[in-house]
Design a protein with these regions (language model features):
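Order/disorder boundary and secretion-linked terminal/linker segments
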Residues: 14-73, 82, 185-205
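Localized edge beta-strand/strand-to-loop motifs within extracellular or lumenal beta-rich domains
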Residues: 140-154
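Intrinsic low-complexity, disordered N-terminal segments enriched in polar/charged/small residues
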Residues: 3-5
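Short amphipathic beta-strand and strand-loop transition segments with alternating hydrophobic
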Residues: 44-50, 131-139
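Acidic/polar low-complexity flexible segments
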Residues: 20-25, 80-87, 95-101, 159-205
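Beta-strand elements of well-folded, non-transmembrane domains
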Residues: 50-52, 62-66, 95, 110, ...
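Extracellular/luminal beta-rich ligand-recognition
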Residues: 78-133
Length: 205
């Protein structure tokens, strides 16, 4: 599939009023990487909105034959690694032109992970965060929705940063255990959510 690069699919905010309590944004449509198609998925969209000065809310909407999608069992929720080995929703957030960024993983199991990178796939560490993301999940026969609210104010590299670059992605596991990789923009070659070209959304607040 071609990389998504259309004005109606990529939302760019040029102004943000810190006095506002929320901003609603248009949905961004994710596409499967050409090497990992999944015909059981009809669509996968993400809505990103800002609430208060330092909260980002990610809402992922998957439309699919859920009998053919493996979803991790829901639990108490907590920090966990390797969530991308199964169905998982992801976001990558960078501050302005800085080489470093944060990776956010949200699982339908309610588990989560936040990693800090000093540069492209370098210096990976667990990000220190004062409060876990607030995750909610709803599932039906023909789809799944996951919403996660992240408090950027608890992340030193992103606190009070006016210009953010954001990449959106997801991993969907089918009934046979195969993984398909979904993103807003795919670089050439194999799936790579960390690639700088994937940071297709900009938020100026």
């Amino acid at each position: 599939m071609p990389a998504v690069d259309r004005d109606d699919d990529v939302w760019v905010a040029h102004e943000y009023n810190r006095g506002m309590t929320s901003i609603d944004m248009r949905s961004a449509v994710l596409t499967a990487h050409p090497s990992t198609p999944n015909d059981d998925v009809r669509s996968l969209a993400v809505q990103l909105r800002a609430e208060e000065p330092d909260i980002l809310v990610f809402q992922y909407s998957l439309v699919a034959d859920m009998s053919r999608v493996r979803v991790p069992l829901s639990g108490a929720g907590g920090r966990a690694d390797a969530l991308w080995e199964h169905t998982c929703f992801e976001a990558f957030v960078a501050a302005g032109d800085a080489p470093g960024y944060h990776e956010f993983n949200f699982s339908p199991s309610l588990d989560w992970a936040i990693y800090r990178f000093s540069a492209y796939r370098e210096g990976m560490s667990h990000a220190e965060i004062g409060r876990a993301p607030e995750i909610s999940v709803g599932q039906r026969d023909d789809g799944l929705e996951l919403e996660s609210a992240v408090r950027l104010g608890h992340l030193a590299d992103l606190r009070d940063v006016r210009h953010l670059r954001i990449a959106l992605a997801a991993v969907i596991e089918d009934g046979d255990g195969r993984l398909s990789y979904w993103g807003l923009r795919h670089p050439p070659g194999k799936p790579d959510f960390h690639h700088p070209n994937g940071f297709a959304l900009e938020l100026v607040r």
